[in-house]
Curated annotation (Swiss-Prot):
<feature type="transmembrane region" description="Helical">
    <location>
        <begin position="247"/>
        <end position="269"/>
    </location>
</feature>
<keyword id="KW-1133">Transmembrane helix</keyword>
<dbReference type="Pfam" id="PF03601">
    <property type="entry name" value="Cons_hypoth698"/>
</dbReference>
<feature type="transmembrane region" description="Helical">
    <location>
        <begin position="273"/>
        <end position="295"/>
    </location>
</feature>
<keyword id="KW-0472">Membrane</keyword>
<feature type="transmembrane region" description="Helical">
    <location>
        <begin position="9"/>
        <end position="26"/>
    </location>
</feature>
<keyword id="KW-0812">Transmembrane</keyword>
<feature type="transmembrane region" description="Helical">
    <location>
        <begin position="122"/>
        <end position="144"/>
    </location>
</feature>
<feature type="transmembrane region" description="Helical">
    <location>
        <begin position="93"/>
        <end position="115"/>
    </location>
</feature>
<feature type="transmembrane region" description="Helical">
    <location>
        <begin position="183"/>
        <end position="202"/>
    </location>
</feature>
<feature type="transmembrane region" description="Helical">
    <location>
        <begin position="308"/>
        <end position="330"/>
    </location>
</feature>
<protein>
    <recommendedName>
        <fullName>UPF0324 membrane protein SACOL0411</fullName>
    </recommendedName>
</protein>
<dbReference type="InterPro" id="IPR018383">
    <property type="entry name" value="UPF0324_pro"/>
</dbReference>
<dbReference type="GO" id="GO:0005886">
    <property type="term" value="C:plasma membrane"/>
</dbReference>
<feature type="transmembrane region" description="Helical">
    <location>
        <begin position="217"/>
        <end position="234"/>
    </location>
</feature>
<keyword id="KW-1003">Cell membrane</keyword>
<feature type="transmembrane region" description="Helical">
    <location>
        <begin position="154"/>
        <end position="176"/>
    </location>
</feature>
Length: 331
């Protein structure tokens, strides 16, 4: 019996790994490199669920990917941060980043209220838009006690919209006259994922990409204080409503902070850092596959339309406002 359970666990884990690896490699191909591995992974998982159903017998391995590998990926995500660079070279951008995070969450909730959408998904999208996309959504989902299908829908939406916006940014840069500093800073402080920032920022050249990454990593850094604030708010609300259902601290975020400190104070060989970043990406993709398997097409039909409209409106407003601020500071 135990061996059968172990076999089912390994099959479930292998399923998420195979789809994740395929998505990782497919995203390196022309055209698909614009779509992104996250989007590919989630779409494959949702299509698998639609045509084959949820593989219930392998759920232990799938759940392991959606919970433990996701947390491990977020811990390793901290290795992307160098706190000295963000506070030093990127201090001006960090000030903008604070405004971006606050604006994204508040605007998302405001538009969502007008559209009578799902508040939990709007919160996830607000944090994802303001901070760092899928990783931020996954990090705060336990704080909001979000359902896995809501987390998956939010991540799928933000991956798709971020890709579209990054392509729009490259078109705007090609058509209109814009300095590399303005373009890089604008991309860094307003696009959703690091991958989107790399895609758009890289189009402006190495100087634009450098400042874009500084702007983006400042937002990743803000995940630390933001989660603390959110935990305090949710704990206060839970204590007001009842003593039950206390909000626990997502301890993997402590690992995220430790990794950020390690990368700041310890010189890690670039080869090792590349390996760890790849491991982090694969683990994150495996988690996305596992989350995507929890989403049926009827969920997308019933729950994704209003959040999609909400994030489009919010992203347009954020991009416009961010451009005005960046143009004023860097022109």
């Amino acid at each position: 019996m135990a061996s059968l359970k172990n076999k089912h666990f390994m099959i479930g884990l292998s399923l998420t790994f195979i789809v994740a690896l395929f998505s990782f490699l497919a995203a390196k191909l022309p055209i698909l490199d614009k779509v992104g591995a996250l989007t590919i992974a989630i779409l494959i998982a949702i299509l698998y669920r639609h045509f084959r159903g949820y593989p219930e017998q392998y759920s232990s391995g799938i759940t392991f990917s959606s919970k433990y590998l996701l947390r491990f990926a977020i811990i390793l995500y901290g290795l992307k941060l160098n706190i000295f660079d963000i506070i030093g070279q990127g201090s001006k951008l960090l000030a903008i980043d604070v405004g971006v995070v606050i604006f994204s969450i508040v605007m998302m909730l405001f538009v969502n209220k007008l559209l009578h959408g799902d508040k939990n998904i709007a919160l996830l999208l607000g944090v994802g838009t303001g901070v760092c996309g899928a990783a931020a959504i996954a990090a705060v989902a336990p704080i909001f006690k979000s359902r896995e299908k809501d987390t998956a829908i939010s991540i799928g939406i933000i991956a798709l919209i971020g890709t579209i916006f990054s392509l729009i940014y490259t078109a705007i840069y090609a058509i209109f006259s814009m300095t590399t500093n303005v373009y890089g800073a604008w991309s860094g402080v307003s696009l959703h994922e690091i991958a989107h920032v790399v895609l758009a920022g890289g189009f402006g050249g190495s100087d634009a990409l450098k400042i874009a990454l500084l702007g983006k990593l400042g937002r990743v850094f803000l995940l630390i204080p933001l989660t603390i604030v959110l935990i305090l708010i949710m704990r206060f609300r839970s204590s007001e409503s009842s003593s039950k259902g206390r909000i626990s601290i997502p301890y993997f975020l402590i690992g995220f902070v430790i990794m950020a400190l390690v990368n700041t104070y310890v010189t890690i060989p670039s080869a090792l850092l590349n390996i760890l970043n790849t491991v982090s990406t694969i683990c994150l993709l495996m988690a996305m596959v596992a989350l995507g398997l929890n989403v049926a097409f009827k969920d997308l039909k019933n729950r994704a339309l209003k959040p999609l409209m909400t994030i489009i409106i919010t992203s347009i407003c954020l991009s416009s406002l961010a451009f005005i601020v960046v143009h004023w500071l860097y022109s």
